[in-house]
């Protein structure tokens, strides 16, 4: 790429449409909000301060049940709180999928003999679902 690069907005818009055409309609509609063509030099020279019309979407809530790049509060807190503790078994009170996702993160690298002084490879979960947490899940314990 050089400094005299020309921004072909029409080409980029067609490429975005081509990518979105591979998704089902509902998914394409949601993803379209996150894709946009950068404005050319002319728009910046005319005083436009935004480089793209789409804006930042990282501060909106995730859709429950959908894996995102950002992860979730559960996986983040598990990694921060339990990540450094390698010499005890962790019991996770949450869904199996959440437990596995948070268990498989890179902060689970460890040094030690599994089952003796390191229990990182073991993932125990009560498989609590939302209804168990709201209405009491003591029978599952």
UniProtKB/Swiss-Prot annotation:
Bound cofactor: record note: Binds 1 [8Fe-7S] cluster per heterodimer. Binds 1 [7Fe-Mo-9S-C-homocitryl] cluster per subunit.
One of the record's GO molecular function terms: ATP binding
Biological process annotations from GO: nitrogen fixation
Keyword annotations: ATP-binding, Iron, Iron-sulfur, Metal-binding, Molybdenum, Nitrogen fixation, Nucleotide-binding, Oxidoreductase
UniProt cross-references to Pfam families, sorted A to Z: Oxidored_nitro
Cofactors, names only: [8Fe-7S] cluster; [7Fe-Mo-9S-C-homocitryl] cluster
InterPro entries (UniProt xref): Nase/OxRdtase_comp1, Nase_comp1_asu, Nase_comp1_CS
SUPFAM superfamilies assigned to the protein according to its UniProt record, in alphabetical order: Helical backbone' metal receptor (SSF53807)
E.C. number: 1.18.6.1
Annotated catalysed reactions: N2 + 8 reduced [2Fe-2S]-[ferredoxin] + 16 ATP + 16 H2O = H2 + 8 oxidized [2Fe-2S]-[ferredoxin] + 2 NH4(+) + 16 ADP + 16 phosphate + 6 H(+)
Residues that coordinate or bind [8Fe-7S] cluster: 72, 98
The keyword Nucleotide-binding belongs to this UniProt entry's keyword annotation: yes
Source domain of life: Bacteria
Family statement: Belongs to the NifD/NifK/NifE/NifN family.
Subunit architecture: Tetramer of two alpha and two beta chains. Forms complex with the iron protein (nitrogenase component 2).
Free-text function comment from the UniProt entry: This molybdenum-iron protein is part of the nitrogenase complex that catalyzes the key enzymatic reactions in nitrogen fixation.
Name of this chain's protein: Nitrogenase molybdenum-iron protein alpha chain
Gene name tied to this protein: nifD
């Amino acid at each position: 790429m050089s400094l005299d690069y020309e921004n072909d907005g029409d080409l980029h818009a067609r490429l975005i449409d081509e990518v979105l055409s591979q998704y089902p309609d509902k998914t394409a509609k949601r993803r379209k909000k996150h894709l946009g063509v950068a404005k050319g030099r002319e728009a910046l020279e005319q005083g436009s301060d935004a480089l793209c019309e789409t804006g930042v979407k990282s501060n909106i809530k995730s859709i429950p049940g959908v894996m995102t790049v950002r992860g979730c509060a559960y996986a983040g807190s598990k990694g921060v709180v339990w990540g450094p503790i390698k010499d005890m078994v962790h019991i996770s009170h949450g869904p199996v999928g959440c437990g596995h996702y948070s268990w498989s993160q890179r902060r689970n690298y460890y040094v030690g003999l599994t089952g003796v002084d390191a229990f990182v490879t073991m993932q125990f979960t009560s498989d609590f679902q939302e209804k168990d947490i709201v209405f009491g899940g003591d029978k599952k314990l």
